[in-house]
Amino acid sequence: MAQNIYTNVSKNITKTWMLMALFFCLIIALGYFLSLYYGSANILYFFVIFSILMNLTSYWFSDKIVLALSGAKEIKKSEYFDLYTVLENLSIVAGLPMPRIYVIEDLAPNAFATGRDKNHAVVAVTTGLISLLDRSELEGVLGHELSHIGNRDMLLSTVVVVLVGFVSIISDIFTRSLIFHGGDRDHKGGNVLMLIGIIFAILSPFFALLIQLAISRKRELLADASGALLTRYPEGLARALKKISQYSRPMIRQSSAIAHLYIADPKGGGFGKRITGLFATHPPVEQRIKALMG
């Protein structure tokens, strides 16, 4: 079973970094087309500098942004003693600092991890998750989230969110500028460049979204594997995933920007079954359970 779960872990990490590199190439390509069309290299420099600034901002404030969007509130050990002690024990086993714990008042069972590194990590769970799962299942979910922290998934996931938004915004600006100012260039070369630019600007957000979804699905499978290794009881996480998937109602506060951070789609299990796998933020539950149980 262990070999079945962990064989592709290192391969998935390599592929993820390749996808991240592709994101930066998209940004540079957009800036290049725009700078070439207007004959100004400063536009490309602006794109590069602005993308770096956005990534720095996301690094320092990612946890605050995500927690604000989710409506999570920090709790004390006395308020949720069992939850706190389970996470505390797993953190010791994983060799990680104890993350801060946040709770979301929502009946939909779900959880996520955020923060810029293991020393500034946060694990958030819904009240529905706490009431639905038994201790071994809760350990499985928390082990999954700690694996995101240990695997440094949180920062990568946040950067993906920022880059998808950045590519979409710049593509929109690029498309509008080419359409409204395309008449200024009547020569054949200018028209060809405008056509290429418009096609690229329209398609790049779509490909950026696909990259975001691909990274999310790979990271979830990796965290499942690492979480099972941490608890040494993959059946606990498998049972938890099955219970979570059977809850069909969406979360009260959900944002597509952070949907991929959750252990399950916040839109609910019913919605997830109706959309195609290509646009799903998470791998199919059946696939995840099969991988865990071997």
Enumerate the predicted regions with their spans.
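Polar-ligand-bearing catalytic/cofactor-coordination segments
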Residues: 1-24, 36-37, 43-45, 50-194, ...
